[in-house]
UniProtKB/Swiss-Prot annotation:
GO terms for biological process: lysine biosynthetic process via diaminopimelate. It catalyses: (2S,6S)-2,6-diaminopimelate = meso-2,6-diaminopimelate. InterPro entries: DAP_epimerase_AS, DAP_epimerase_DapF. It is found in: Cytoplasm. The keyword Amino-acid biosynthesis applies. Keywords: Amino-acid biosynthesis, Cytoplasm, Isomerase, Lysine biosynthesis. This is Diaminopimelate epimerase. Pathway: Amino-acid biosynthesis; L-lysine biosynthesis via DAP pathway; DL-2,6-diaminopimelate from LL-2,6-diaminopimelate: step 1/1. Substrate binds at N11, N62, G72, N73, N160, N193, E211, R212, G221, T222.
Length: 277
């Protein structure tokens, strides 16, 4: 299997052109290639496929083999993958995902993609569509307790579920201990990604994320979009802000007119290779 390892702010996946080569059993392949000791090492596997409704289709799998709806960091890399490999000559393309069709605008320098702006669509705020078991609409400051820990969560879906709460010092927070308790909480029928956020100023927030099925990652694009949404709903930031993640910064904007979330950030190729599977 030919592959390319890429990352968006350290959120790394193995990217495979599944148009020119047939890939069977991607769930097991993802578990194998993701292993950082016995495989290639990644947060998961991304397949680029043909689409009947968009320029390309992406399917993505977490390191535990489960399929995910969407990943903001991964979709930026898909844009770079197809452009840099001359699978398209367009700087604006559409990608079919399990969370709908996304539009990518790519910034090109010296024939290569350096930045990708993604129209992530409208955030989903209805409890049953996120999904979260709550009577609130939107779900702002839903008090949830797991073991001895209690937080007020604001819940948003960007095609995948996110629960966001605000704390004083995100760097010192014991995420590995507390994140998984809320990921699998009964309030979330399909589990959830969990974001812990520190407010820096009206234009900047800092976050760490416990990703559903992957644990802590260096960055989560949909998580950054959900955090911006929650922060606007709570009046903490304006409609455009910098979201600081462990792997770097993303610029997120909640457009006032079309109500869509736009995410801008880098995409990086690490190396290419072949592996027997």
């Amino acid at each position: 299997m030919k592959f390319t390892k890429m990352h968006g702010l350290g959120n790394d996946y193995i990217y495979v052109d599944a148009i020119s080569q047939k890939i069977e059993n991607p769930n097991e392949i993802s578990k194998f290639v993701s292993d950082r000791h016995f495989g290639i090492g990644s947060d998961g596997l991304v397949l680029i496929l043909p689409s009947d409704v968009a320029d390309f289709k992406m399917r993505m799998f977490n390191s535990d083999g489960s399929e995910a709806e969407m990943c903001g960091n991964a979709i930026r890399c898909v844009g770079k993958f197809v452009y840099d490999k001359k699978m398209t000559d367009k700087s604006t393309i559409t990608i079919e995902t399990l969370a709908g069709i996304k539009v990518l605008e790519m910034t090109i320098e010296n024939g290569k993609v350096v930045l990708v702006k993604v129209d992530m669509g409208e955030p989903i705020l209805k409890a049953e569509e996120i999904p979260v078991l709550s009577e609130k609409h939107p779900v702002i400051d839903e008090e949830i307790t797991a073991k001895d820990y209690c937080y007020n969560f604001t819940c948003v879906s960007m095609g995948n579920p996110h629960a966001i709460t605000y704390i004083e010092n995100v760097d010192e927070f014991p995420l590995e201990k507390i994140g998984p308790l809320f990921e699998i909480h009964e309030k979330f029928p399909r589990k959830t990604n969990v974001e812990f956020v520190e407010l820096i100023d009206k234009n900047t927030v800092k976050m760490r994320v416990w990703e559903r099925g992957a644990g802590e990652t260096l960055a989560c694009g949909t998580g950054a979009c959900a955090v911006l949404t929650a922060s606007v709903l709570k009046g903490y930031v304006g409609r455009k802000a910098t979201v600081k993640l462990l792997g770097g910064d993303l610029t997120i904007e909640w457009n006032e007119f079309d109500k869509h979330i736009y995410m801008t950030g880098p995409a990086t190729t690490v190396f290419e290779g072949e592996i027997d599977i």
